[in-house]
Amino acid sequence: MKDPAPVAIVERHQPARATRPVTEPIREEKMMEESEQSQDLTSRRSFLLKGAAVGAASLGAGGLLLEPSEALAKPRSKGGPKGGLTKGDAAILRFLAAAELIETDLWQQYNELAGIQDREVPGGSGSPAYAEAISVLDGDMDQYIHDNTDDEISHAAFINAYLKAHGAEPVNLNKFRKLPSSQATGAQQIGRLTNLMELTVDTSFWTRYRSDSQNPDFGDKLPQAVPGLAAGRFPAIPRSDDDLNQPDHLQAIANTAGFHFCFIEQGGTSLYPQLAQRVTHAEVLRILLSIGPTEAMHFQTWSDKAGNAPPLTDPTNGLVFPDLNADGEATQTNLIMPEPTIFLERKFPIVSIIRPTQTKNAAMGAVNALTADGLFRGQSAEFFAVLKGLARAADAARHG
């Protein structure tokens, strides 16, 4: 079966510093019209908005936004791939662009309620009670949430701009922004790509990075740090203001968010090195090697903060957050640096590494992990077809 046509990511516009893209889909149509007049194409925001305005005029197969073939961008001068991107490199970048938009969408929701709403990351007005529960994990959580959101916006914007500069189709998932928003005060009432209100969070990353003898690349299955999170469906943001009334329930929501932050960013930490092994051109490799480590920085930050989640039982659903320091080094909270473990072959000495980094089916593995997380609950069959098509194309890429 032929893969669905790749689509193009677009971000939304708010008057702001010219170098920061914005994510406000509720105002997108009006802002796109304004952006066509005089915005500088070197701006991340204006570049993507112009692409949106053009792409909207050229609906492709299945109703997905496609860029017209004419002059997607002026040819790169030096440093870039001569003759354009290889099919495989373009497929990898398109999948990563889609992944970054998905990340942007979920981080935007967290920022609206518990981050800092400003000109860099506008949207929403905050939920003081939820933000206070989040701050139990660290007093600077609002700044970290804001900055993680801004980083993901920049990743999506850059990758799409690079694709366009080399005559390849950028990606746009806007037609799939149909999932409901939180009804809690502070959240924008706009369509979303992701669902943060019915999550099933895999916390095996916690024990994976603390093990000195196991590695998923060898087929090892690591235990859950918070077993309950992987065994049900739980909100990581308040669904409505009713979720703010019971203190332990609200803290459980904040704790869930803390571990979800880790889950999302450990995925990116592995995905970039996994796909880097499949690229052909040195500059595309440079992109993956430059963005990937920022995901690792996010992951380590959130690992430190999640360790501060207070042990408790949610009185509304029985979700238990255990004392992670009660069972030894496998879950000890201050062990946030990757424990040396087996790599490549067991005959070699153990070494501190990112894991997994096996490249086979890496993109589809990421899609499956996010789906199992509950992040796409409520999404359409077409959405899954598009995302899996992008993943298959990325996984089919071959180096050289």
Predicted features along the sequence, with ranges:
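N-terminal secretory signal peptides
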Residues: 1-42, 70
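All-alpha RGS (Regulator of G-protein Signaling) helical domain and cognate RGS-like helical scaffolds
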Residues: 33-35, 52-56, 65, 69-400
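Membrane-interfacial loop-to-transmembrane-helix junctions in polytopic alpha-helical membrane proteins
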Residues: 41-44, 86
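N-terminal export leaders
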Residues: 43-59
